[in-house]
């Protein structure tokens, strides 16, 4: 499998060939793999899990793993090792996944089931306080008066990591496009830490390991502040990040100036990748060495995009981090 020649240390043996889906490098970045599930695989999955509405997955968390098992069985056991090895591979850590035939908002429940299956083949999605579930669905429209940039369409949502303002391990983030109408622009923006031109400079700065305060606006429904540094390291000493510009609260002038320079450097990176994501497709990335954001939309009175996110921890094996994770 040529797509996996970059993986040095496997956590599970890889299959000789994928079954029920194909794998190819993304046109936008060789780090990003595209997994495309055959229509027959998708239809078989939808039929096999039809007995469980999404509410059943909400109420019985073990069913999230069962639907993952069903999808892996339909792929003859080839899917879980591919997902796990890719999400943990420092040279990759990112996938754009397309289930052929799931491409209309009327199939939203099946989209949620499919994404849940993939996520629970690598770990478990965390409780999302904003929605009160293990996932969150939200809508972007032409006008917005919310308290964060999440739903604001006419500006860039800057590069960030998820899970910065909660005391939860957030190894991965999954972002699904459920629907869109009258859309122009709004591509996903990604940046791998190892591609960021000034990563080493900021990682080695004294501020990199300083504990900072992170707060969330009321819409996030998180009452307590959390404290952690912007940078951390993995078990091999490589940089990881937990950063979002909107929610970090610098204590003083020095922290504020450093954070501003950090933000300018990330946004000015020429290594940012712009990725179009079709309806029904989703990104699944390692949250600790990929940053993500969103490009602006072209204004339109009928503009609408519905999204779903899941974020959680990798359960096989537990990734090791030096601090804070």
From Swiss-Prot:
Belongs to the glutarate hydroxylase family. InterPro entries: GlaH, TauD-like_sf. The gene is glaH. It holds the Pfam family CsiD. It is an enzyme of class 1 (oxidoreductase). Homotetramer. This is Glutarate 2-hydroxylase. Its EC number is 1.14.11.64. Pathway: Amino-acid degradation. GO terms for molecular function: ferrous iron binding; glutarate dioxygenase activity; oxidoreductase activity, acting on paired donors, with incorporation or reduction of molecular oxygen, with 2-oxoglutarate as one donor, and the other dehydrogenated. Keywords: Dioxygenase, Iron, Metal-binding, Oxidoreductase. Its cofactor is Fe(2+).
